[in-house]
Curated annotation (Swiss-Prot):
It is a multi-pass membrane protein. This is ATP synthase subunit c, chloroplastic. F(1)F(0) ATP synthase produces ATP from ADP in the presence of a proton or sodium gradient. F-type ATPases consist of two structural domains, F(1) containing the extramembraneous catalytic core and F(0) containing the membrane proton channel, linked together by a central stalk and a peripheral stalk. During catalysis, ATP synthesis in the catalytic domain of F(1) is coupled via a rotary mechanism of the central stalk subunits to proton translocation. Key component of the F(0) channel; it plays a direct role in translocation across the membrane. A homomeric c-ring of between 10-14 subunits forms the central stalk rotor element with the F(1) delta and epsilon subunits. Keywords: ATP synthesis, CF(0), Chloroplast, Hydrogen ion transport, Ion transport, Lipid-binding, Membrane, Plastid, Thylakoid, Transmembrane, Transmembrane helix, Transport. One of its GO terms (cellular component) is proton-transporting two-sector ATPase complex, proton-transporting domain. CDD domains: ATP-synt_Fo_c_ATPH. It comes from Tetradesmus obliquus (Green alga). Belongs to the ATPase C chain family. GO terms for molecular function: lipid binding; proton-transporting ATP synthase activity, rotational mechanism. The chain crosses the membrane at residues 3-23, 57-77. In plastids the F-type ATPase is also known as CF(1)CF(0). The record marks E61 as: Reversibly protonated during proton transport. The keyword Plastid applies.
Amino acid sequence: MNPIVAAASVVSAGLAVGLAAIGPGMGQGTAAGYAVEGIARQPEAEGKIRGALLLSFAFMESLTIYGLVVALALLFANPFAS
């Protein structure tokens, strides 16, 4: 394998995981804050808010998992290496 391609793959894998975690991390923090605020305003809606929050957490976390899959593909099944 070309050393430049190997180095670029490692850097790209690191960036893929790092950048894929930034957005969902910020989104989860914002969503949790608004969920706590909503539960404080309407305690009787706690179950619905919590269910919607957990579902949205799953969708947000899937973006991070996709970044991890791309990083693993770049490291171990690199399509750019000959």
